[in-house]
C-alpha cells in the first residue's frame, strides 16, 4: 500500500520530470554500474520485477477459465497482469506507478476481440494494451500544475509578508510584550524560515532539470493530504540506466538535501511551537489557576530542540536506506520518523484545548465567570488554528476520483498548506482586538503630529489618546480580550497617563473588583 505522508511541502512540488522509462537495462551493466543508476530508477524497476513475478505466480495459481464461449488467456503484457477475459470485452486497470510520468489515477485498457484474441496494434501486429491515458503530462494537467506552482509561490510570499509585519508589531509596541507573545514570535519565525526555504526550493530546485530529471520524484504528496502525480514543466529528457546519472556527492545534490533537511526541521518546529502554545495555555488556565509566571526555557527546548532529533534520524536513515536525490520521494515509510511526532503533537494539542475549554466552561458556570470568559476569548485563536493547520493530516487523506472534485480538492488543499503562515499571522495578530486598538491609538497619535506639523489646531493629547485607553480592551458586553496576563509595572495615576505597561489591564483586575 502506497505510503501516506504528511509533508506540508509542500510540495506541491512541481518537479521538472519527464522521463521516458526504459524497462530493461543493458546486459553489459556491472554491479558497480548499477550503483550509479538513479535511485528511483532502481525503485521503479524493482516494482516492475515484483509485479511480473506476482503475475506469473497468479497465472499459475488461478483455476482454469469456467466461462462459456471464446475468451482471451491470462497474460503479462510487459507492464501489467491481465486475467482471462471473455471475447468482446474491454478490460480496465489503473495505470501502474513504476514511472514518474505515469498517472496512477488514470486507466489502462486492453481489448479482447470477438475471436478470443487480445487486440493487436495495426502498425506492429503485436498484442497491445492502451497506456496512452496514463500520460501525466497532458496539457490540462500541465496547466493545473502551473496554477498550483504559482499558488505556492504566492501563498508563501504572502505568508512571509504577513508574518514579518506581525513580528514588527509585536517588537515595536512594548505594551504587547509578554510570555505568550514571545511564544507567538518564535512560532512566526519558524513559519518565516520555512516559507523562505520552500520558495528557494521552488525557484532553484524545481526548474533545475539537470538535478531533478536525474532522479525523478513524485510531486504531490499522496499522504494524508497529498496525492502522487508527475508533471513536466520543461522539454522532455529520456531517462535510462545510463542517462541521468548524478554523483551522489555532487554539490547540487548535497545542497538540495541540506535544503530539504532544514525544511523538514522547520516544518516540525511549526507544529511543536503550536504545541507550546497549547501547553502554555493549559498550564496557565488548568494547572496554575490563572497565573502566568512560567519558565520559557522548557518551551524553547520543546519548540526548537526536540524537532532536530527526528529530523537528524530521518536524514541518516534516508541516506542509508532510501537515498534519492533531494530526499523528496514519498514512496518510503521513513517519513513517519518526522511526521509521526508531528501527528502526535497535533493530537496532544487537540486534547489540551478540549480540556481547557472544559475547565473554562466549568468556571464560567461557577466562579470567576468574567475572567474565565476572557481566557476563553484568549484561547479562541489557538482553538481555530490547531484544526486549521492539522486538517490536511486528518480530514483530507483521500483525493476524490471525480476530476472536478479532484481539482477543487487540489486548490483547497494547497491553499491550506501554502497560506498557513498568512493564517497564523492573521489570527494571532491582525484579528486580535488588543493589537487593533494599539494600532488605532498609534494612528491617532500620528494624525495629531501630522496635523500639528502643518499648523493645524492641536487638540489636547490626553483626550485623544486616553479615550482609546479607556476602551482599549473593551468588547461588546463589557468584557476585555487580552493577549497577555500580566501585572502592571507601576500603579496607574489619576490622569491615566502612566508608563506604557499600565495600559495592559491585568486579568485579575476583574476578580479583585468583584471581591471588593
Swiss-Prot record:
- Sugar-bearing residues? 28, 73, 125, 130
* Protein localization: Cell membrane
Extracellular domain ranges by topology: 25-146, 203-256, 318-333, 397-404
Record-linked PROSITE patterns? G_PROTEIN_RECEP_F2_1 (PS00649), G_PROTEIN_RECEP_F2_2 (PS00650), G_PROTEIN_RECEP_F2_3 (PS50227), G_PROTEIN_RECEP_F2_4 (PS50261)
Under the heading Gene3D superfamilies, the entry gives: GPCR, family 2, extracellular hormone receptor domain (4.10.1240.10), Rhodopsin 7-helix transmembrane proteins (1.20.1070.10)
Q: Name one GO cellular component term.
A: amylin receptor complex 2
Task: Alphabetically list the UniProt keywords.
Answer: Cell membrane, Disulfide bond, G-protein coupled receptor, Glycoprotein, Membrane, Receptor, Signal, Transducer, Transmembrane, Transmembrane helix
Q: Which superkingdom? A: Eukaryota
Q: What functional role does this protein have? A: G protein-coupled receptor activated by ligand peptides amylin (IAPP), calcitonin (CT/CALCA) and calcitonin gene-related peptide type 1 (CGRP1/CALCA). CALCR interacts with receptor-activity-modifying proteins RAMP1, 2 and 3 to form receptor complexes AMYR1, 2 and 3, respectively. IAPP, CT and CGRP1 activate CALCR and AMYRs with distinct modes of receptor activation resulting in specific phenotypes. Ligand binding causes a conformation change that triggers signaling via guanine nucleotide-binding proteins (G proteins) and modulates the activity of downstream effectors.
What protein name does the entry list? Calcitonin receptor
Species this chain originates from: Rattus norvegicus (Rat)
